[in-house]
Amino acid sequence: MWIRQDWLDNLGLEVPRTWDELVTVAEAFVTQDPDGNGEADTIGILGPSNSDHMNAVGNNQYGLDPLFSSFQSYPQYWLQDEDGTVKYGSIQPETRTALEKIQKLYTDKLIDQEMLVRNDSKEPLLAGKVGIFFGPWWSGYTVADATLAGEADWRAYFTPLAEDGNYYTHMPNPTRDRKSVV
């Protein structure tokens, strides 16, 4: 999770560690003019573009996978529970809960209102209008671009903890890449 530290500082906010704290920070980023330009023109949480996915198995720049993981929801994954039963993650109760929470973020305008419609999610990021985004390991390059484009102080933090106080993420098992040995 990448957050504008300068916006946190401007508003006197702490780094969010839980879902509720994330919602509080996103709301402040949308309603309290963190960039100080006197306009209501900031996006709390950036969403994926029209060529990306809300969640994905693999490459997912600006996707919302960490929000799903906060509820131990893993859409598009086949999961094995404690007794060995295989279940499809997209239809589990945890996914419904995650979708309801994400829907509320959208309804409350705390998440990108143009997500999945916008042609390029990087545009508002480079324009300095975004407070939080999620991305894979190579997001540091995006942050470097955004920093060069303005005064942004982006920092990487853990995504929100689940209600049980643990940190969850998704990772295929077994994990593999596209290398071959001949």
Region locations from a protein language model:
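Extracytoplasmic/secretory soluble proteins
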Residues: M1-V182
